[in-house]
Amino acid sequence: MRSFNFCNNCGKNGHLYQYCNDPITSVGVIAYKKDDKELKYLMICRKDTLGYIDFLRGRYTLNNIEYISSLIDIMTNDEKKLLLIQDFENLWSELWGSNVGIQYRGEESSAKEKFVKLKKGYFIDNIFYNLEKIIKNSISCWIEPEWGFPKGRRNYQEKDLFCGLREWSEETGYDESSINIITNILPYEE
């Protein structure tokens, strides 16, 4: 029997994204221009840090304070402040806007439970931990989120080039017709 499962990660048939054994794949376009014999690359600044997103999504266990601290350490000062002064519903709504897809709705209640417990505080091995204490102990002072090349995940059965152009256009606001594609080069992998 023929399988109609298509993986949005590796682009192969036979399995779905959540069962893919390949590393998570993002596809993008690296745009550059030559200016006075110097190459200049177009990069974008993320709206939110990866640490902030993973923290709000509840992608940690409450007994792993070291990992929670590492998420806090890669957040901006403003993000840390928001965690202390806003409730979960506002933070979640600001993170996703009106684009909360079904894929994130399932983790919202679990993430909220963790957030509320962390804000109130709890004991691990007779030591009290809460969000305020963890943030106070953070030594990082990031002013802005990470910068990177515009990229994202492919849609169902989308080819790499079309995905890269779509993501580039969505994240930069430029029309994809404003660039020339260089062909016959190997893709960049990090």
What are these regions (language model features)?
Residues 27-31:
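Short beta-strand scaffold segments in enzyme catalytic cores
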Residues 39-166:
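Conserved Nudix-box catalytic region and its N-terminal flanking loop in Nudix hydrolases
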Residues 177, 185-190:
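Active-site-adjacent beta-strand/loop module that shapes the phosphate/pyrophosphate-binding cleft
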Residues 4-15:
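Short Cys/His-rich zinc-binding micro-motifs
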Residues 172-178:
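Short secondary-structure junctions
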Residues 17-21:
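Cysteine-centered loop/knuckle micro-motif
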Residues 34-38:
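Short strand-connecting beta-turns/loops that link adjacent beta-strands
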